[in-house]
Amino acid sequence: MRLFLALLALGFAAVAAVPAYPQRIVGGSTTTIQQYPTIVALLFSRNGNTFFQACGGIILNNRNVLTAAHCPHGDAVNRWRVRSGSTYANSGGAVHNLNRVRIHPNFNRRTLDNDIAIMRTTSNIAFNNAAQPARIAGANYNLGDNQVVWAAGWGAIRSGGPSSEQLRHVQVWTVNQATCRSRYASIGRSVTDNMLCSGWLDVGGRDQCQGDSGGPLYHNGVVVGVCSWGEECALARFPGVNARVSRFANWIRNNS
């Protein structure tokens, strides 16, 4: 899920991945996995038996999935599974167990800097029209301000509201880094160069939300962000914050 700042302030960054408050798409509409075959649902179990969708992920290749570090951080690898190839959060497609989770070595559980991880599945993800490897932004990917980007996920449809069983998507825009940094500094939060802000600035109503954490932010079909955190969801003053994929291009390549 995308983490609420209230949880961070209480020091719960590590446990939120399951979350008490997972994130979902706000202000968007339903879509299908055929439109976003690079996204997967990450399933979590508290007891090792019953699994439910708690985060999103992005297919890198037939054995590796990119996600937010705060989702699996601190959990045993067998508490997470990957559902690929399904429009629905908790049914359909193929479910894969994991044999490894690699958290970025500089991940900061308090600030959520370097909020990125790679999960390795025990079985191959079969590619078809509902499951495909993503195009990932390279180190020199040029992404300007006010660019149209799209987010997708199964998260909440409003802050604190119910999650969506069907995949949803929403159009938002990239937000100037200095503006985003200033907005969050006013409430004591740090936006680093490893982060990418998006939303509908000064309007609100569109965003990623609880349960969308780890899911993709696309620019012209290229994954440029991984859903990370924000002040509630879809507020006019505070954009959503993603891990900026271009900053991690080499690490992703070397670990997948």
UniProtKB/Swiss-Prot annotation:
GO molecular function: serine-type endopeptidase activity
Signal peptide annotation: 1-17
Species whose genome carries this gene: Manduca sexta
SMART domains, sorted: Tryp_SPc
Tissue expression remark: Midgut.
Gene3D superfamilies to which the protein is assigned, alphabetical: Trypsin-like serine proteases
Listed CDD domains: Tryp_SPc
Annotated catalytic residues: H70, D115, S213
Annotated keywords: Disulfide bond, Hydrolase, Protease, Secreted, Serine protease, Signal, Zymogen
The protein, known as: Trypsin, alkaline A
One annotated Gene Ontology cellular component of this protein: extracellular region
